[in-house]
Regions:
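Asp-box/BNR beta-propeller blade signature and adjacent active/binding-site loops
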Residues: 80, 106, 255-256
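Conserved radical SAM core fold
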Residues: 84, 122-123, 159-161, 249-255
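Glycine-rich, proline-tolerant flexible connector loops at the mouths of alpha/beta enzymes
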Residues: 82-102, 157-160
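Active-site acidic/histidine proton-transfer and metal-coordination neighborhood
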Residues: 16-26, 37-41, 99-115, 120-219, ...
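Histidine-acidic metal/acid-base catalytic patches
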Residues: 2-28, 32-76, 200-307
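Conserved beta-strand positions in the central sheet of alpha/beta enzyme cores
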Residues: 81, 115-117, 153, 247, ...
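Metal-dependent catalytic neighborhoods of phosphoester/phosphodiester hydrolases
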Residues: 90-99, 127-130, 290-292
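Generic detector of well-ordered alpha-helical packing
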Residues: 82, 122, 195, 222-224, ...
Length: 307
């Protein structure tokens, strides 16, 4: 009898049956299991480092991205998230030679490259300047594809947009982000908009822009430290379904007060949502990142053991 392996594989994926077990099931495959979809608590977390944690040293030229790769390997991170600012020549994209050297070194150190990001402002009323930012994002989408990076992080923006309403800003921002997402689709790279306490301040703001763009190639870079009105954990719960990557910071803001993050509470929210992917860590403020990052990493690892 001729075996339709394509159909068989489709059913195995659908019902989650492993190949060795499925080989002996025969006609039983026609009976769907009680739960054909993964349960809500199926999750997989991979710890990455957002390179902004080393911003001061990188800006000063004391270290470079290759030094941060070594640091990530020494501390057994799963991945690195190198923001575009730290590549040579930014806002221009890095050369092929640099891209290939960076990819090679990350691979040899056992590190994924989980994301990158640019500095843009889609709140800017001037369409010429916004068009330039869209062009920059699309160039970095292509660079991300060359680097094997699955997403490019963008901001909403900080411009005061005098003379224009928030509704107007949302309209032109949605169109600009759609253009970026269309380019991302061509290159297999998602656009991750970050809630950065800029134009996007609340979970409702995030919901609104994602609904308006309505693209499978747009997701949320969920920044836990940038919900600064009310209860951040409630805001995170409202937006977690949109998250495709994160910025896990030491502190959150509870009713306007900076407070150490409750990582156990946070990771239970993320786990309950069934999130699977990278959790990039980012330290901010004064202090030595060679001390601060390992401390944050240890706190995160301890919290993950409790969920």
């Amino acid at each position: 009898m001729m075996v339709n392996y394509r159909e068989k594989r489709r059913m195995l994926i659908k019902y989650g049956v492993s190949l060795p077990v499925a080989a002996g099931l025969g006609s039983l495959l026609s009976v769907p299991p009680a739960r054909a979809q993964p349960p809500n608590d199926v999750h997989k977390f991979k710890i990455s480092l957002n390179v902004y944690s080393f911003n001061r040293l990188l800006r000063a030229g004391t270290i470079d991205l290759f030094d941060v790769l070594t640091f990530c390997a020494e501390h057994n991170f799963d991945a690195i998230d190198p923001t575009g600012y730290y590549f040579p020549g930014y806002p221009d994209v890095p050369s092929d030679e640099y891209v290939n050297r960076f990819k090679r070194q990350a691979f040899l150190l056992g590190l994924d490259i989980s994301g990158t990001g640019v500095r843009n402002d889609f709140v800017q009323p001037d369409p010429v300047q916004r068009k330039a930012d869209v062009a920059m994002v699309t160039q970095w989408v292509e660079a991300a594809a060359r680097l094997g990076i699955p997403n490019v992080r963008v901001f909403a923006g900080t411009h005061k947009h005098e003379g224009y309403s928030r509704d107007q800003v949302f309209e032109w921002m949605a169109q600009d982000i759609k253009t970026c997402c269309q380019h991302g689709k061509e290159y297999g790279v998602m656009v991750a908009i970050q809630n950065h306490n800029d134009f996007l301040k609340t979970a409702a703001d995030v919901d609104r822009i994602l609904t308006m763009v309505d693209s499978d190639w747009l997701g949320l870079n969920l920044d836990i430290g940038s919900y600064r009105q009310g209860d951040p954990y409630q805001e995170i719960e409202k937006n977690v379904r949109h998250a495709i990557t994160w910025q896990i910071k030491e502190n959150v803001w509870v009713n306007g007060q900076e407070t150490p993050a409750d990582f156990v509470k946070l990771f239970r929210i993320i786990k309950k949502a069934g999130y699977r992917g990278y959790l990039p860590l980012e330290t901010l403020g004064e202090g030595d990142p060679y001390e601060k990052v390992p401390r944050l990493l240890e706190n995160v690892r301890q919290a993950l053991q409790q969920i």
